Amino acid sequence: MKKGIHPEMRLLTVRCACGAEHKIWTTKEQLKIDVCSNCHPLYKGSGGASLIVDTEGRVQKFKKKFEGKY
């Protein structure tokens, strides 16, 4: 590796809006995040992939179209 052309890596403590702190290696000097794995609904099990929001009936239309074919 050539000297002087690579950015300096440092261990940074990232602070989330919920108060959690995570340590990562980065070239940034400061990083703040709004949501982390401690407060995101997908990781907490209160929604995410298990929650389907369908306001226009697309899921029902799809199920009706392919009902009994597979």
Swiss-Prot record:
Signal peptide: none
Residues given in the record as Zn(2+) binding sites: 16, 18, 36, 39
Domain of life per record: Bacteria
Entry keyword set: Metal-binding, Ribonucleoprotein, Ribosomal protein, RNA-binding, rRNA-binding, Zinc
Keyword rRNA-binding listed: yes
Protein's UniProt keywords contain Amino-acid biosynthesis: no
GO CC annotations, alphabetized: ribonucleoprotein complex; ribosome
Cofactor note text: Binds 1 zinc ion per subunit.
Protein family according to the UniProt entry: Belongs to the bacterial ribosomal protein bL31 family. Type A subfamily.
Function: Binds the 23S rRNA.
The protein's name: Large ribosomal subunit protein bL31
